[in-house]
């Protein structure tokens, strides 16, 4: 089966996710099905924790990350916390911490940074993560209607959100943001800034 995600949109812009997944094809990927040669020929490897909720796919993800790191790829991570997919939030926190320890580029949402740092202050949260995980070179926070923040070395950038009138659903906006950041990274960075 293909995992199905259902999104309920509230009038205030918040969303609630529910899933039809057990089992889903995304949970069943094993290490021997990963295209390691394709990873080795790439410049960037992006992953999230949705592929770390179950043992087989978690092992496949970790081996893919190891292959990417061993071949000098830029490693990008988006926690993409979806509580209904986890056995426990402690397990989610542990796997997110693993992802944070592996990445060069991080895209994290406002609720995820609070989940991992205990603060809703983005500057404090970014400092906590970058001190705890010095491997993170570029940290991006998406905050929905409150815009986005980027941190690189001593530089902090803020961009207000851009909403068109009549916007109904922003699902996927964070993924689009992340894809755009990664595209620009590949254009302007010839090698990871490790």
Regions found by a protein language model. Give the residues of each.
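Structural alpha-helical scaffold elements that stabilize or flank donor/cofactor-binding regions
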Residues: 37-38, 99, 132
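Conserved beta-alpha-beta core of the PfkB/ribokinase-like small-molecule kinase fold
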Residues: 52-128, 146-147
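Conserved phosphate-binding/catalytic region of the ribokinase-like
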Residues: 66, 119-190, 194
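Acidic, amphipathic alpha-helical patches
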Residues: 35, 96, 167
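Conserved N-terminal subdomain of the carbohydrate kinase-like
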Residues: 1-49
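Glycine-rich beta-alpha junction loops
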Residues: 1, 23, 81-83, 112, ...
